[in-house]
């Protein structure tokens, strides 16, 4: 968590400094984004490490698309790297960033269309991102093609049921601390009055306000629930972006206002100190208000499977599966061979072993079926035989055919052909990209040396 927090601060600082062209802007963006309410919620209340990891790369993803249209694509490869990291850390955040990128491209289409080189650059970086991450998304698509899952038929959450009220937004639950929006608006209004308002900061304010409104029922989330975007689950996830735009807007506007005042360095320090105070305010809200509802667990809570089973979302289980008849049943963890139940052993590598004893024929193993499972049995004579593995249509568990008496059976997961191939593709792609980056770097250094020699 500490490493992720530090990395979040570094990426936010780099983004704020690059867009604001000021170290002060970078510092303010870093503090406000890292100590933003929703970020602290993710760390201390929701313990959503995937989303916390994704928040490291959201500033870089925005900087990549901003650089593409506003800076002449000077940071080549940033789009590929940031979106690849988002894909591998938190898929939903990746999808939301793709939507953000599409909206940005549509808004700046004239500039992109005027420079066809940018279209080619986007396509090449998107292709590189797909190659680098195919070892993740190709196996996922393979599993979806092989069977149905709860996430397809019965999502755990519907977005229209998880919207925020305006009161909840103002109070700050799962939201940015509203004081940040207020300060940003005040700074923009003061700057407009002084006629030094920052257009980028104003756009950040408008974007943040729109995102907050989108968390309410005003946005047509019921229509979203009819599409695959139902996997967003919680509309208040948008606070990842709201917090970033608030932090960036405050940073950009602060720099412009500070320039009006004498003693730039002193006022820059005061600005950074003020942002830290806002961050401490957010931390206090999370610590004193939110955490209070999570520390008073009843005695024996962790030992009660009825309480803890729901922590692991079941939406990635096969659609035929039912926790009540597997994890929550009296015979949980046991192999069913007709009317006989056999206690087996789970291995540290995810495998499952059991001794068949008198049982023979068809058996149901307490492991949910996914494409790639294999099984083998060792008879008394020591002969090894591979067993046909399939999915039980009633429970979604692994089904084994033709178990022999007194054999030792082991069920384990083995990579499919697509998984092995996709890993090779990603590895080769990464090597080629690194070689290309090294070649570009060497060529640039030679060019600098040549130019220096000519001078």
Tell where the protein language model's regions lie, with residue ranges.
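Active-site-proximal, structured, solvent-exposed surfaces of multi-pass membrane proteins
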Residues: 326-455
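Membrane-embedded transmembrane-helix bundle of lipid-linked glycan/lipid transferases
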Residues: 1-293, 408-412, 418-455
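Membrane-interface segments at or immediately adjacent to transmembrane helices
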Residues: 291-350
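Solvent-exposed, flexible loop/coil residues
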Residues: 47-48, 53-57, 228, 236-238, ...
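Alpha-helical protein-protein interaction elements
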Residues: 75, 128, 279, 306-308, ...
């Amino acid at each position: 968590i500490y490493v992720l927090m530090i990395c979040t601060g570094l990426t936010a600082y780099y983004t704020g400094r690059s867009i604001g062209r000021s170290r002060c802007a970078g510092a303010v963006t870093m503090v406000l984004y890292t100590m933003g309410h929703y970020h602290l919620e993710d760390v201390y209340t929701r313990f959503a490490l995937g989303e916390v990891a994704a928040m490291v790369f959201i500033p870089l993803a925005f900087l990549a698309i901003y650089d593409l249209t506003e800076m002449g694509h000077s940071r080549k490869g940033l789009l590929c790297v940031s979106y690849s990291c988002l894909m591998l850390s938190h898929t939903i955040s990746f999808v939301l960033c793709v939507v953000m990128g599409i909206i940005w491209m549509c808004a700046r289409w004239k500039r992109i269309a005027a420079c066809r080189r940018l279209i080619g650059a986007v396509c090449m970086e998107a292709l590189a991102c797909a190659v680098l991450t195919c070892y993740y998304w190709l196996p996922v698509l393979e599993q979806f093609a092989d069977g149905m899952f709860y996430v397809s038929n019965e999502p755990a959450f519907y977005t229209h049921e998880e919207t925020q009220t305006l009161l909840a937004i103002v109070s700050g639950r799962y939201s940015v601390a509203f004081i940040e929006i207020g300060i940003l608006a005040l700074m923009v209004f003061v700057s407009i009055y002084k006629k030094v308002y920052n257009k980028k900061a104003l756009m950040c304010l408008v974007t943040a306000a729109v995102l907050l409104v989108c968390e309410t029922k005003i946005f047509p989330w019921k229509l979203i629930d009819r599409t695959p975007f139902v996997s967003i689950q919680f509309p208040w996830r948008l606070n990842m972006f709201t917090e970033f735009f608030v932090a960036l807007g405050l940073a950009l506007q602060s720099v412009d206002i500070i320039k009006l005042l004498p003693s730039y360095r002193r006022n820059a320090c005061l600005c950074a100190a003020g942002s830290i105070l806002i961050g401490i305010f957010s931390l206090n809200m999370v610590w004193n208000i939110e955490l209070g509802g999570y520390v008073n667990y009843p005695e024996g809570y962790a030992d009660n499977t009825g309480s803890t089973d729901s922590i692991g979302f079941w939406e990635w289980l096969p659609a035929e599966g039912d926790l009540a008849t597997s994890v929550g049943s009296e015979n949980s963890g046991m192999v069913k061979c007709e009317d006989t139940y056999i206690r087996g052993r789970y291995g540290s590598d995810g495998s499952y072993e059991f001794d068949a004893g008198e049982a023979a024929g068809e058996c149901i193993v307490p492991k949910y079926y996914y494409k790639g499972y294999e099984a083998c049995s060792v008879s008394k004579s020591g002969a090894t035989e591979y067993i046909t593995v399939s999915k039980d249509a009633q429970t979604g568990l692994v089904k084994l055919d033709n178990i022999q008496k007194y054999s030792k059976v082991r069920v384990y997961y083995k990579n499919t052909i697509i998984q092995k191939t996709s890993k090779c593709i990603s590895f080769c792609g990464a090597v080629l990209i690194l070689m290309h980056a090294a070649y570009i770097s060497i060529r640039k250094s030679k060019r600098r040396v040549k130019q220096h020699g000519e001078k």
